[in-house]
């Protein structure tokens, strides 16, 4: 009998959607297992008949990553609402793919689409410092003070944006490189400083660019790009692991010294679980990782599965 796995992971590996989106589809009653509505946390195997929106789900053999030059007016959703054109309807790709992240309806430029859920998780994982580059035109002239304040960080959505690189390219235009992806971040940053975005185009995500892709067209990732992307993702994962180890170490010391609690137990558990997942993904355990004391061998490298 085939090994059973959680249904959100099954759907992710089948290229239907990310695990988070799978959980949402399950809650909405859009997923069935052997004719019955799926339940959150349910486990399935290849012997089960899984359907998404009444369409049978099969594991993908070919893994795909598309680079799409999205025009304005296309929504980054796999579910059509009203008379909007979704990115999947627009592409009409022979395999079922879904967007990696978002690019709002009014924005244009590089959008990645894939049928590999784990890749989505790696790219979108919070805390990974993946570069994304944009060209932006605003409604009035920018100056050195605007560039300075945008670069330093702007208060939006109950936080302050990370420092970023901003270069003025024209009287009313600039390029910006972000390492985070808050909702409508650039538009909110500009609005805070008294500007309105008139054009927003994403030019690059990590090593992947729009070069050679006309608006409305797409191409598959090349073998060389795959190799470079995997290297960047692994490097980013290691950086995130180091950050997590430092935070967990500070929290543990504060606890044993009966100091002020710097994070809640829930936050500690979430970071610990993320660290374990990254260790499994990369096959690496840092020498000072707190997971070493709970069954891991204290080595720098572990065999990858």
Regions found by a protein language model. Give the residues of each.
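Basic, flexible Lys/Arg- and Gly-enriched helix-loop patches that mediate nucleic-acid binding at interfaces
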Residues: 1-236
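Phosphate/adenylate-binding "loop-and-lid" substructures adjacent to NTP/NAD/dNTP-binding pockets
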Residues: 237-305
